[in-house]
């Protein structure tokens, strides 16, 4: 006879979870001193704790309401005639020609690199676009998606998704990881589920996890964060607490960035006490993880427009709300190119920090360093797509960061860690030579980025923007079966990040066995 059922346990925990207000820190119980133990012999209470969590998320996966899992009804009306084209570049000025033509026709540029430009447009606009392009570009494009509406529909969670659909296109090693992984990461999750999950993590792992908020969005939503570490268990600290900040979801449609933040948070949380490397890194640093800094836009991308990019703040043009959060920071802000066009996907606002969410994150970071006894030594801003690791500066290639050599060394180390984990290749370059700069050359501002602000204004020694999977086959509509593999490779990169920033004292930390696999829940 079973003493507990998953439903009974879940119902017992619901008051506990609901009692934790979103955006507030959770007071931990008396300090716990973690011990190291093996995967095969977990502590009894840890085993029960993990079983409870696994049971809860099994229930959520099977009984998730249609409100969260059903795609918006207007997908085919909005995107039924849209396609995504990739233009292959042969000459440097071709990217500028494409961007200029896209601005004239109000098209959505998905990606600009030194090799290609991806553009979304209605199929009946293709002749108009080609007429504005040089002859060399008129025959140098290929379709990436010829039925965008169906691709968008497929990106939403489905309660009837078959195992064969889920497993298509993945290597056997990746499938093995997914089969052992928490079901929470087998689908993209709406904000309401993510917030409840964060509260549960803080409640169940209170020795080293707290839930907090970095501010409130324009529409009044909390911007929740998880703070991982053991500093709250220490009565005295010597100097500011070293902190690593990881942010996702600046652009609402980049769902993989939000899911990756939750995956690496869960990996750090559950490896604590099991892995000596993770345990030491959580003793040395506070890790602050924000799944989405743009909750309003993220919710809107679930409920109304899957490809929404900006926040939901009103602008001077009522029909074109939203400011690009990654163009709104007050270091080398350059919003003149988009000031007169609030409809632009890159609209930077009428002045620096007009985007409320960017302002809130900056205020939180400044308060942490000025009053909270913290030193933000690392900043990782996760985006998609194109598989790039970018370091400062983004606003200009004529300005060289004073710590360029260290920035390059660590960036190459992150790329190597990813390659060793999944065999995926991430390009390493200055942001001014990557996607951001190509956009700037084409008249799209690249100033006002979070990457540059943290590095220059807050003196964060290691500041990066990481463009996650893939290289364009799916673009912003990366299938959910890539959540786990992407999370694994970024988790390994984060451990490499923490070890490098720590320096010589961490030279004895071994990451060889850190594959990014989840600690089993049963």
Swiss-Prot record:
SUPFAM superfamilies: Zn-dependent exopeptidases (SSF53187). Binds 1 zinc ion per subunit. Residues 20-159 form a propeptide. It is found in: Vacuole; Secreted. Keywords: Cell wall biogenesis/degradation, Disulfide bond, Glycoprotein, Metal-binding, Secreted, Signal, Vacuole, Zinc. One of its GO terms (molecular function) is zinc ion binding. This is Inactive metallocarboxypeptidase ecm14. Zn(2+) binds at residues 251, 254, 383. It comes from Penicillium rubens (strain ATCC 28089 / DSM 1075 / NRRL 1951 / Wisconsin 54-1255). Substrate binds at residues 251-254, 309, 326-327, 384-385. One of its GO terms (biological process) is cell wall organization. Gene3D superfamilies: Zn peptidases. Belongs to the peptidase M14 family. Its cofactor is Zn(2+). The gene is ecm14. Inactive carboxypeptidase that may play a role in cell wall organization and biogenesis. PROSITE patterns: CARBOXYPEPT_ZN_1, PEPTIDASE_M14.
């Amino acid at each position: 006879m079973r003493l507990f059922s998953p439903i009974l346990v879940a119902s017992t925990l619901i008051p506990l979870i609901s009692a934790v207000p979103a955006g507030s820190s959770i007071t931990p119980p008396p300090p716990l001193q973690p011990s190291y133990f093996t995967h095969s012999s977990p502590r009894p209470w840890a085993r029960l704790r993990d079983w409870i969590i696994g049971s809860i998320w099994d229930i959520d996966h099977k009984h998730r309401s249609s409100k969260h899992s059903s795609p918006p009804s207007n997908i085919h009306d909005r995107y039924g005639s849209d396609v995504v084209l990739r233009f292959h570049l042969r000459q440097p000025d071709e990217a500028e020609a494409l961007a200029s033509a896209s601005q004239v026709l109000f098209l959505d540029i998905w990606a600009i690199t030194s090799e290609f430009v991806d553009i979304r447009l209605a199929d009946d606009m293709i002749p108009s676009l080609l007429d504005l392009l040089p002859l060399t570009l008129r025959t140098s494009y290929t379709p990436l998606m010829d039925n965008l509406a169906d691709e968008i529909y497929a990106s939403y969670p489905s309660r009837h998704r078959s195992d064969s659909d889920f497993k298509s296109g993945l290597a056997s090693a990746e499938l093995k990881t997914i089969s052992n992984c928490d079901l929470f990461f087998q689908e993209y999750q709406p904000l309401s589920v993510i917030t409840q999950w964060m509260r549960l993590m803080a409640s169940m792992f209170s020795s080293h996890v707290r839930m907090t908020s970095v501010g409130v969005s324009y529409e009044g939503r909390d911007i929740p964060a998880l703070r991982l570490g053991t500093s709250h268990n220490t009565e005295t600290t010597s100097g500011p607490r070293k902190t690593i900040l990881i942010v996702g979801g600046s652009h609402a449609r980049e769902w993989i960035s939000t899911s990756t933040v939750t995956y690496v948070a869960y990996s750090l949380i559950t490896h604590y006490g099991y892995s000596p490397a993770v345990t030491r890194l959580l003793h040395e640093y506070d890790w602050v993880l924000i799944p989405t800094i743009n909750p309003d836009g993220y919710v809107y991308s679930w409920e109304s427009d899957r490809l929404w990019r900006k926040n939901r703040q009103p602008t001077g043009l009522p029909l074109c709300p939203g400011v690009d959060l990654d163009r709104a920071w007050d270091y080398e802000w350059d919003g003149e190119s988009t000031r007169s066009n609030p409809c632009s996907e890159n609209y930077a606002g009428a002045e620096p920090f007009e985007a409320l969410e960017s302002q809130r994150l900056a205020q939180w970071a400044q308060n942490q360093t000025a009053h909270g006894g913290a030193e933000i030594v690392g900043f990782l801003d996760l985006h998609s797509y194109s598989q790039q690791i970018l370091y400062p500066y983004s606003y200009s290639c004529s300005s060289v960061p004073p710590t360029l050599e260290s920035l390059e060394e660590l960036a190459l180390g992150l790329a190597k860690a990813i390659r060793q984990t999944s065999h995926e290749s991430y390009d390493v370059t200055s942001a001014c030579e990557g996607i951001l700069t190509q956009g700037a050359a084409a008249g799209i501002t690249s100033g006002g980025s979070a990457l540059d602000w943290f590095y220059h204004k807050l003196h964060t020694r290691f500041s990066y923007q990481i463009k996650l999977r893939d290289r364009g086959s799916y673009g912003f509509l990366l299938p959910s079966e890539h959540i786990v593999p992407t999370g694994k490779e970024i988790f390994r990169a984060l451990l490499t990040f923490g070890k490098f920033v720590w320096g010589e004292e961490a030279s004895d930390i071994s990451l060889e066995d850190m594959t990014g696999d989840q600690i089993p829940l049963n």
